[in-house]
Structure formats: C-alpha cells, structure tokens
Amino acid sequence: MKAALLHQFDKSLNGPDWLSYEDVSDPVMEEPTDVIVRIGGAGVCGTDLKLIEGLWCDHMRIELPIILGHENAGWVEEIGVAVESVQVGDPVILYPTAYGDLEGSGATGSHHFRKRGFYPGFNRNGGFAEYMLAEESMLLKLPSHLSPMDTAPLADAGLTAYNVARRASKHLAPGHYTLVIGAGGLGHLCIQILRALSSTEIIVVDKSETALDLARSVGAHYTFVADEHYTEKILALTSGKGVETVIDFVGKDSSVNKGLFVTRRGGHYYLVGYGGRLTISTLEMIRSEKTVVGVLGGTFSDLKELLTMVDRGLVTLTTREYALNNANKALRDLKDGRNYGRTVLIP
C-alpha cells in the first residue's frame, strides 16, 4: 500500500520534506479483535508537526520510521474472528487510542490516560496510508449520510473541542462570557458546541481576519484581532470584570498570559494548545481563585455525543482536502497558517 512515513525528526521544522511517500507492506491482523480499515480520510493536526519536531519523544516511545495520522475514518475492510460490533463495508470513525474494553469502563471513562493500549500515529502506524490496523474498541459507526472524508478530524480535533466545551459549559450561565483563543480547526468547532451546550456569550480572538470570519460564520458573538490591545477591549466589554471562562487553543506564552489576565476572579482557564510556559505567582492564584485546567482529547462517549450533534446539524466541520501524496504540502500549509478549519488527507 501507499503511505506517508516519518523517517527522522526535524526540531527546527525547516526541512524540505518531512514525510516520504512510498510503498509499504499492508497491515496484518494479529489479534481476534483486530480490524483492518480502508482509510477514507486522515486529519492533519498541529500535533503532527509537534511529532515531527520530536516534542513527544520525552513523553512516549516513538520508533521511526512511523506512519503518522491519529484522526482517521474509513470503511471496514477486514475483521478478526471475535469482532461483533462492525461488519465489512461499514463506514467508521476511529477513536484515537485502543484499549480492548469496548463495553468496559473505557467506553465511558477517561481511558485516554491509561498506560495499556496503543496510540496510532504516535507509537503505532496511523492513518496517513491506504489501510490501517485498528482494534474493535476504537471503532464507531458513522451515520449513513456522513462520509469518512468529511468526518475524520472529528476523531481528535472535534473530540477535544467537545470535551473542553462540555466541561466549560458546566460553569456557564446566561450573561456569562467565554473567550476562545484561536479560531482555527478546533476553535470553529468549539464555538458551535458551546452554542449547543450553553447560553454563554462567545468572544473569539485570532491574529487572522480570515479565521475571525470563520468564527463569525459559525456563531461567535464578538471577535477581536489578537493584537496588543485585545485584552483592553475584552475588559471594556465585560465592564472590567473579565470573562468567566477562557479556552486557549494556542498555548503560547502570549496567549496564556493575556488569557489569564482577562479571566475573572473565580473563573476557569482551559489550556488545550501547548508549546509555551504557564507562569503565575502562587499569591495571584490564591487571591484570584482562578482554576487552570489542562485538556487532552476526550472519552469514547464524548465522540459518540459529538457525532450525534453533527448528525443533527448542530455542528459542521470546515475542511480542506489534499491527496495523500501531497502530505508535505498539507503540513507546510498548516505550519504557515494557510489553512482554516481542518486539513484532511485523501488516499
């Protein structure tokens, strides 16, 4: 089969081609609950760039070469003898980790924290290929009118956006404000989910006017360019109190510092993006009683609930498609900020 492989890390992200498009052996089932999926679409994520940088090597054993791709959807091609929940030909989306306990606590709990299992695109070959080896516990059937090409990024970007919006909505009431930092692939999904789950007033900041146009089109109430003055505008809008909730999809030093600054006393700051440093005095944390929460992925139940929202038309996904053999261009465009919404590779 054809696949896009990472053979070496590039800490500076200055190399000409990060992935090699080549012929590799088809995946082979080894366990009775294994499933071979024919990939219909594989989302390209900012985390893929972090993997190429080697940023995850301190947190996970990554053996090269590896096929990246942790946002995957397609059709069941072959099933193991013990597989019961899907049949050959079923369209499916793949939860981004596998644990072999579809009916156990992993189906509802935070099983993305467990040590057992594997992570396609991280420590096992992922979906930047024509076929991928999966496990039955990862698979969720798609509604008949949703295609793998259009839904693949929901497997992680959508999952994460749903998780953080669900958690934030528990603290939101009419008249409350939520600041979303970053209106891109995750941000435009989070805006829609927040509107479906809460009555919060949504403020969005981004450095790109095009991204802010996307934010407005999916329901943002207020948008500001992420310049040196946007915190003043947010404080003016909120009568100097600040916002009840911040959801930061950027995670750089400047976004964290400014986001915490406009979080009101007793407010919640959800950190999804990463790459920067979180620095705040312990006295300030005590005095302000702010809560800072890191968010990683979501549960299998989150993915089910998100798909129900998409099926009902409450959430729509904006995508740009590339052929699999153009994976390097897709990654380069993502790095350079030329894509809005989510990027999908099509084998």
Predicted feature residues:
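Residues in the short beta-alpha loop(s) of Rossmann-like NAD(P)-binding domains
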Residues: 208, 275, 298
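Mid-domain Rossmann-like dinucleotide-binding core that forms the NAD(H)/NADP(H) cofactor-binding site
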Residues: 137, 144-228, 232
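Glycine-rich cofactor phosphate-binding loops and adjacent beta1-alpha1 units
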Residues: 169-174, 212-291
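C-terminal hydrophobic helical "lid"/dimerization subdomain
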Residues: 3, 257-260, 303-347
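Residue-level marker of beta-strand positions
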Residues: 71-73, 91, 131, 177, ...
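Glycine-rich beta-strand-centered segment in the early N-terminal region that forms part
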Residues: 25-42, 56-104, 138, 143-145
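Cysteine-cluster motifs in flexible loop/terminal segments that predominantly coordinate metals
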Residues: 45, 96-137
